[in-house]
């Protein structure tokens, strides 16, 4: 049984940055460090940081006064940021810079008097943060749609002054169809020069298509609450290749491997490589050969830490 590894896979620059911010804050200031929401959607990562002294909370009212709080990579609403400022909390913002870019687009549309449509999944923290970045004091509204049916039912106040943005971790194919539906219904709709789906999401989706075409089974390493990991599993399945989303190697069921001669492995943008290697070891214990890494898009993007934290790290070294 062959093992084929997607390339690229696993951590993206935004996830790397967010995890580094928490780790460096723990190094410099010591525990506890409070983190609003899971810093990234991966159980292994969150548990590892919790063991170091990170305390994960869902809302700021769970945070005592005079502590350090880190905002997760998914971003937060203006209301959350303003509450933190009102309380005088010391904040390090681990919001992915590509999510921040969408926040700025939303605010710019609001200030122009344009209403905004956000394409995204209801309840996802990135969506909640982005919705909360639209400033309704300028007279407009922001609307959420997930699919073409939502677009068909969408009614807006100002169709001639309308724009759209997207969640960064969506399926490119699904999003393209929703954008087409928006443009068909609202021909004057404005949008970003380039869609908001991030480079890492695009690269991993391109890679899993190629991987699935060469595999009898695809395993996606990632947590169930990871949006981009779920999209990878869905994309593999759409090619006709069975696919499973697994958090750990222990979740692999031997019966999945019946009559499988080539198994593909990829990982969501929040899944560490150590989990991929554990999956490889588990498969090899079940008779698989050494893995073959497929060619793919090289990634060399990095994002820097917040300046204050960066300076404190340098001073402590």
Swiss-Prot record:
Dimethylallyl diphosphate binds at residues 41, 74, 124, 226-228, 270. Binds 1 [4Fe-4S] cluster per subunit. Transmembrane segments: none annotated. Gene3D superfamilies: 3.40.50.11270, 4-hydroxy-3-methylbut-2-enyl diphosphate reductase, catalytic domain. Isopentenyl diphosphate binds at residues 41, 74, 124, 226-228, 270. It comes from the Bacteria. Its EC number is 1.17.7.4. The keyword Repressor does not apply. It is an enzyme of class 1 (oxidoreductase). Catalyzes the conversion of 1-hydroxy-2-methyl-2-(E)-butenyl 4-diphosphate (HMBPP) into a mixture of isopentenyl diphosphate (IPP) and dimethylallyl diphosphate (DMAPP). Acts in the terminal step of the DOXP/MEP pathway for isoprenoid precursor biosynthesis. This is 4-hydroxy-3-methylbut-2-enyl diphosphate reductase. It comes from Chromohalobacter salexigens (strain ATCC BAA-138 / DSM 3043 / CIP 106854 / NCIMB 13768 / 1H11). The lineage of its organism: Bacteria, Pseudomonadati, Pseudomonadota, Gammaproteobacteria, Oceanospirillales.
